[in-house]
């Protein structure tokens, strides 16, 4: 059973009401995604516990962050986590579907740790199924929504399973995006990449950055890359 809360250096994430708990994927994305300027407006789609919104607020002290989720329980929990954090005055959490979400202005950074199962058996737990499966948000809908809400010079960042990379990149290209950064992530040196961090932009880039990194060099021994990436967040 997952812990009811996860303590970071500057904030604590309670997660007992959320289907999806704090995990490596969300932490990776929250530490890797970029906002192109300060002050920035940042949109966290499917905020869940509010983890990524909190991480971006810590990394960008002058940014204002909006987190949205369709799950009322997750929204309530994210609001509680934000209220208890040092960043409460810069983060707003709303119950909303990104496909019908309306904002007067665009965002400099749009971030999403999207539902990632496309062909697996659907979990009988409705809350968990919505959080985990693309029945709630297809890549096509996510990409078109992100494009609509992203500023001209903004960045759209996601983390997806490596087996979905080709499909996601094709949808992104058809949706008007250009690939600017790509990082394939291995859990250990001997394993194949499991996840893929992707950054997209509306404007063409001269050359995209393509890397492959590893989380652990040996069991329980984090790589220098992962330690540096998450240094400001993990207590140990």
Spans of features found by a protein language model:
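SAM-dependent Rossmann-like transferase core, predominantly class I methyltransferases
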Residues: 2-41, 47-49, 54, 58, ...
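A generic structural signal for alpha->beta connector loops
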Residues: 10, 39, 62, 88-90, ...
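General small-molecule cofactor/ligand-binding pocket signal
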Residues: 14, 66, 92-94, 180-183
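Conserved Class I SAM-dependent methyltransferase catalytic core
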Residues: 18, 22, 136-193
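Residue-level signal for inorganic ion chemistry
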Residues: 29, 113, 142, 200
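Conserved SAM/SAH cofactor-binding pocket of Class I
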Residues: 31-104, 109-112, 118-123
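Mobile active-site "lid"/loop adjacent to the S-adenosyl-L-methionine
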Residues: 114-141
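SAM/dcSAM-binding transferase cores
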Residues: 190-236
């Amino acid at each position: 059973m997952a812990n009811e809360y996860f303590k970071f250096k500057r904030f604590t994430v309670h997660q007992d009401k959320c289907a999806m708990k704090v995990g490596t994927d969300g932490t990776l994305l929250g530490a890797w995604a970029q906002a192109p300027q300060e002050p920035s407006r940042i949109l966290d789609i499917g905020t869940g516990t509010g983890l990524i919104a909190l991480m971006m607020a810590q990394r960008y002290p002058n940014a204002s962050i909006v987190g949205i989720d369709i799950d009322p329980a997750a929204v309530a929990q994210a609001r509680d986590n934000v209220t208890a954090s040092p960043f409460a005055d810069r983060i707003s959490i709303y119950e909303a579907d990104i496909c019908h979400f309306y904002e007067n202005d665009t965002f400099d950074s749009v971030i999403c740790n999207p539902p990632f199962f496309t062909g697996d058996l659907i979990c009988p737990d409705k809350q968990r199924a919505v959080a985990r499966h693309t029945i709630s948000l297809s890549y096509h809908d996510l990409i078109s929504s992100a494009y609509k809400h992203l500023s001209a010079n903004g960045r759209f960042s996601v983390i997806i399973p490596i087996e979905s990379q080709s499909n996601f990149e094709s949808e992104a290209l058809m949706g008007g995006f250009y690939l600017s950064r790509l990082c394939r992530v291995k859990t250990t040196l001997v394993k194949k990449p499991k996840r893929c961090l992707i950054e997209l932009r509306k404007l063409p880039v001269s050359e995209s950055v393509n890397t492959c990194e590893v989380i652990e060099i040996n069991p329980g021994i984090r790589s220098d890359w992962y330690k540096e990436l998450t240094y400001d967040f993990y207590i140990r």
